[in-house]
Amino acid sequence: IFISVITYVTGLALEGAQWPNWIYYTAFPIIVLYAISQFKKQNLNILSLSQALKVGVLIGVISAIVIMIYSMIFNYLIDPEFMSQMMEVARDKMLENPNMTEEMVDQSMKFIEMFSNPAISGAFMIAMSAVFGLIYSLIGGLIMKREE
């Protein structure tokens, strides 16, 4: 949410800057691994792989739900025009590409429009966060597991 606010305030969001997303891509696995280590510490230094997986997936799903709620508040209350502005910027950038035909641009815009639907993007976000939470917790669980 912090990254989203910063990119919105600075105008980076409409420019399509991707580097702020790398902050999230770095922070998410760190948070998952930290949560697993804290769970292990609270559990007398015992951790099974299934416990690690539960923690990781739960962190992923909760983070996606929080981001989804923020996105809905942002897109419906704070700046209802933002998504249409983003779509316009995306269309303009695609039209600047000499290799893209009008048909390709229209097809891409249909795809972007589909994912601008809060229900579809929210479901996708929850699923992807759960999958990445599972992957990171599998790695962390294999490293940190210690059973009785």
Which sequence ranges carry the predicted segments?
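Hydrophobic alpha-helical membrane-insertion segments
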Residues: 59-81
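Membrane-interface interhelical loops and short interface/amphipathic helices
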Residues: 78-115
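Transmembrane alpha-helical insertion/packing segments
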Residues: 1-38
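Transmembrane alpha-helical segments in integral membrane proteins
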Residues: 117-147
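Cytoplasmic-side transmembrane-helix entry/capping segments in multi-pass membrane proteins
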Residues: 23, 48-55
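Alpha-helical transmembrane segments of multipass membrane proteins
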Residues: 3, 7, 28-32, 63-67, ...
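Short helix-capping/hinge motifs at transmembrane helix termini and TM-loop junctions
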Residues: 11-12, 71, 75-79, 144-148
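Membrane-helix interface/capping segments
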Residues: 37-51
